[in-house]
Amino acid sequence: MTAQSATARSHLPLFLALLYGVAIAYASLQPFANWMAPPPGTPFFLFGPLAPRWTRFDVAINVIAYAPFGFFVALVPRIRPRARLVVALAAGTALSTALETAQMFLPSRDASTLDLLANTAGTTLGALLALAAARSARAARAVTVVRQRWFLPGTVGDLGVALLAIWLAVQVNPGIPLFATTFDTDLQLDPALASAPDDVAAIVVAGATSAFQLLGVGLFLALLLRERRYIGGAVLALIGSALFVKGVAAALLLKPAAWHHWLPPGVSDGVAAGALLLLGAIGLPRPVQVALAAIALLSSVLTPLLTPDVLFAHAPLSGFAWSYGQLLNFNGLTHAVLLAWPVAASAFLFALAGRPGWGEPS
């Protein structure tokens, strides 16, 4: 099977496009409250005036946000090469138009033609990048070899890889510590808060959450692999990628005084403990790994219930070197995905374990 034919049969781009589209919809419509009809006489947003106040930064964020969506749609299988750009552009425009229309019923949101244009431009940019990548035989072959050699075959493997990619992508929020699911309660630049004594309970809970998350995600990855001999390298690559994404995001998005907060002492201890637990768990039978992964993932969501200060912590906006309105969308989306991901991943693993003859890695 050639790289092109294998890529064409893969459902991974479709799953990524669907998951990313849901993420865009959530970010565009949250907090899903106070819906009301527009005042009488309000024109449809396409025929209304442009927003009186806008920044180049917000426009750039919209372009960047929709570029991955266009990229994934353009790579969806069974679309003729000549039609990929048109299909991606139509999908991005339709999604953006639907969401901007829905925003007309949310007083906290502003439906804007400028947003639609920026979103469409981002979709087009992503689709063009996908077409350029698809023309590179070397790049297509490299992706196909990794996908086929390392991970489970078929639709199940594609969906698992898509879920793993979504988890890695949301590590881009440095306001949420490494392998955590809630915001860092200490990431505030208020001197009064900075001088307060450390909450031991919050530190313990944060460490336990990170340990559970690392154990669960590591086992999730191990269960996606074809052969056990790939587990060590794959887990190290995953942890290294998460460290890289979180560290770069902290350097770019946080103020210098808050750079270290993405890896506080409690979390670093939890990551170390989770790594040791994972080392002992990768040799267990796969049915046991499924149960242990689900317990660990769900525990990473339930553990913050023990400390309301951690559970209801708000996004630490003062620690970000980013004062634009898109920051609320960014924090809300990444936080929601991190809370929902363990549930979705656990459901996927139980569905995988229920398939007849899913077998053991070689």
Give the ranges of each region predicted by the language model.
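Bulky hydrophobic segments
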Residues: 1-108, 113, 124-362
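Long, hydrophobic, well-ordered secondary-structure blocks that form the structural core
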Residues: 117-120
